[in-house]
Amino acid sequence: NNLVILQKPAHLRHRTASLVLCIVIINCMLSALTGCNSKKLALSSPISVTDYKLNTYVQIDSYTNVNKNVLSDALGLCDYYEHIFSRTLETSELYKVNTQQTTAISDELYELIELGLYYSQLSYGAFDITIGSVSRLWDFNTDTPDVPDSSAIADALAYVDYTKVSLSTDNDGTHHISIPDGYCLDLGAIAKGYIADKIKAYLIDNGVERAIINLGGNVLCIGQKRNGSDFNIAVKKPFTETGEYMEVLHINDYSVVSSGTYERYFYSDDGTFYHHILNPATGYPYDNNLCDVTIISSESTVGDCLSTTCFVLGLDDGMKLINSLEGIEAVFMTNDGSKYYSDNAKAYIN
């Protein structure tokens, strides 16, 4: 067996971030394909493309023999959607919405905002896509992060309330959004899952039958390995750089998404720990004893939304939500390293 570990190269790591997921692929090195009716040649070693997009390390490994340009074009979708969903990019569609430059929005932005509002409601506002007025005060990507002024946070909280956002569609199909002046939508917690699903659809449309898409904390599989076995997805243990894994999940044609306190964080001068998952009620990071939530689902969009939603709901309410949903499983990890599993999560664990 040939064990391959995919993780973010040291020169691409930000000092306050660590890659959420590693992909572990075990190739059995079969000498011939048997019983395979695929129209395209299945590979034992992948065709790979890598890049740095969406503020993370991204990679596609195709186990179908296709032109490498197909994979590069698929990763190019990251740029396309960033110009729609980015809160900070001044040329993006969302930026223009947040700055009241437009009310007419694209199908893609309408779809993602509608989804964000649904999960904001599902969490009773514990997750809120209007957190942008607060999140723009926190910069977890700078080399010198600092805690925002408390009065600035208090002022920003006056502009956090997802119920003030409304969507509509004209008879001709044109979508519109209405948000109060001063409000700022932030779709960063859910956009990568949506983009991963779009990349998967593009690859399938272009003949890819077996592949792994890795957008940092979002891993999405197409099909299974050429011998019919599952892909093995290793969920990195929080706050480690030594290759320790929280779990190794066995999936095919499914998604694995993790959200946690270790993705972006810093320590203040007095040693206080601050991470990027902010509480819409306080403007400060959540402190609910969770450090990671990993979601197993068929769609990465759903996994992205639920990983954040379940994190902010906390262990008890988050677990209740997952166990009420069909076809979705989760693994929760608390700060002491204890792991908690949804009803059928262990079916994906060795």
What is the predicted function of each stretch?
Residues L3-I5, P9-C22, I26-N350:
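Mature catalytic core of soluble alpha/beta enzymes
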